[in-house]
């Protein structure tokens, strides 16, 4: 199943991720499908929900498009955001849905349009989650500001649903200088993605650091890195890689 995360913007205007060039603007036109996809594509739309205010015309939404480009189904929720949506081995979907200062992670059954289970975390604005198997969920915990210490505790954790515990944790300030991206603040890393990439390795996307990294879960070492903080010729505050 192909997956794509589409994040609706919170402002009335739409800003492209690349510089706008009027001469290159040819307008929007229908695409042409030259061959069918291998399966459906599920898109998550962020929706609009801010400080208790919602816009009924901009709900958080999951949309499934079949292999031939036709709409299969939609699933809307109000008072929430949808970020990552990932396929699970059983054909269901893993969804990250922040709301009101917490994050709800749930398994969604496309056939019944119902949640199989859900977990609530005291985490704000969580974009990236990933299923690692054996009831383990990796969570990119951004905006984890430690006000009393004046430092960022932004991290990636692995939560085990079977035992209701965090069993692995990787904190960015243990691996980056404090002056990275201008120094600690309440959105220091904006880590927006976590994905398993091989045996015991995670791909992380600290957006504000202009880089994507691979971390060995056993040694906790950064074993691969693409990009450097401030070098926008390689990556410039990327979204999910």
Which residues fall in each region the model found?
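Residue-level detector of Asp-centered blade-edge/turn motifs that repeat once per structural unit
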Residues: 35-38, 87-90, 131-134, 196-199
